[in-house]
Amino acid sequence: MDRIRIVGGNKLNGTIPISGAKNAALPLMIAALLTEETLILDNVPRLADVAQLQRILGNHGVDIMSAGKRSGDHEYQGQTLHISAANVIDTTAPYELVSKMRASFWVIAPLLARMHETKVSLPGGCAIGTRPVDLLIMALEKLGAEVAIDGGYVIAKAPGGLTGAEVDFPKVTVSGTHVALMAATLAKGTTVITNAACEPEIVDVADCLNKMGARVSGAGTPRIVIEGVSRLGGARHTVLPDRIETGTYAMAVAMTGGDVLLRGARPELLQSALDVLTEAGAVITPNNEGIRVARNGAGINPVIVSTAPFPGFPTDLQAQLMALMTRAKGSSHITETIFENRFMHVQELARFGARIHLDGETATIEGIGILRGAPVMATDLRASVSLVIAGLAAEGETMVNRVYHLDRGFERLEEKLSGCGASIERISD
């Protein structure tokens, strides 16, 4: 099993290219099931989750061709996927595939919309709280599906096709919004999604669906309207840059000091996180190449932050911010409002000497001047990268175990960081 070895203390200086967003690439790949024609996706990151979804789609008979090139140290366009679902041979998504990645459950929407029946295993993925699929099932039932759960599988049928409806989510749900959006594109009539998630990845998927011939308006607002069409066609779409990767590397620079250009990053995708970093003492400068992040000399200021749906502070950057605040000049408070049990990284950060107190869903971090390297264990995707950030600033050696979590969501992490001066390497046993 691979590990990552870090010797801390080096400032980061240089350029880091930002990859395509995993949280957009996955639903975009799934949307290819809505059409018999080929969907071409550019800037798809090379990640374990993307490879796993390719296996899942292949199980349904989807043909996927991949191409990609590197044209220089800082010019990396990810891969281009040509996805053809012309011959769907199986509408069952089995447990052994779906259990490894929660987002793969979303295939239920296009399979049901286009094939009118599907059987999908209940999902897996990061072990963060319960994250139930109840809201996703509710959305499909609103659109006229007959849904049953049997033997760990969700069985959904719509013999006459789906019908447009009002889908009002009782709380904001990114997964539910993706599922309702994809399913409604081929439903008869008009669907209105209220209390919809506003994340940029939702907008990216809606933009792609519209290129395919869908009629979606309002994506990026709490009210999305979809006029159903009888069929969708092929299209070509470029995956937007990953705002979570952007925020992660920005926090790494704020942690270590230095000056880094995050090439291809778009500030409007994570303005709340950039505002927090500015408050913490980083200098954020957007330009026509991306976002420049610097912290020279001055220490790290403590902050008070609550996670929130977009445009609020992302829950997927909560662990990284906590790592940064371990070195702040004073006490910080971080409240998690999106997921329960998302403080599994606290015990591991404590191994560096961090002082963190938990009270319900709020963590109080007492900043200390020096972290000390330690052997640590990753528990989930975002928690694992918070340990890397801590290790970059810690005195001595840090060994991060279970780095397969990192491979699910960060493309070439060691290469990008070492290219900016970090002492970081992957060790394969």
Curated annotation (Swiss-Prot):
Keyword annotations from UniProtKB, A to Z: Cell cycle, Cell division, Cell shape, Cell wall biogenesis/degradation, Cytoplasm, Peptidoglycan synthesis, Pyruvate, Transferase
Gene Ontology biological-process entries: cell division; cell wall organization; peptidoglycan biosynthetic process; regulation of cell shape; UDP-N-acetylgalactosamine biosynthetic process
Record-level GO cellular component terms: cytoplasm
Positions bound to UDP-N-acetyl-alpha-D-glucosamine: R102, R131, P132, V133, D134, L135, D316, I338
InterPro entries given in the database record: Enolpyruvate_Tfrase_dom, Enolpyruvate_Tfrase_sf, MurA_subfamily, RNA3'P_cycl/enolpyr_Trfase_a/b, UDP_GlcNAc_COvinyl_MurA
Subcellular location: Cytoplasm
Recorded GO MF terms: UDP-N-acetylglucosamine 1-carboxyvinyltransferase activity
Enzyme class (EC, first level): transferase
Pathway: Cell wall biogenesis; peptidoglycan biosynthesis
Chief site of localization: cytoplasm
Entry annotation: catalytic residues: C126 (proton donor)
Binding site for phosphoenolpyruvate: K22, N23
Entry's family note: Belongs to the EPSP synthase family. MurA subfamily.
Function: Cell wall formation. Adds enolpyruvyl to UDP-N-acetylglucosamine.
NCBIfam families per the UniProt record, alphabetical: murA, PRK09369.1
PANTHER family linked to this entry: UDP-N-ACETYLGLUCOSAMINE 1-CARBOXYVINYLTRANSFERASE (PTHR43783:SF1)
Name by which UniProt lists this protein: UDP-N-acetylglucosamine 1-carboxyvinyltransferase
Annotated organism of origin: Nitrobacter hamburgensis (strain DSM 10229 / NCIMB 13809 / X14)
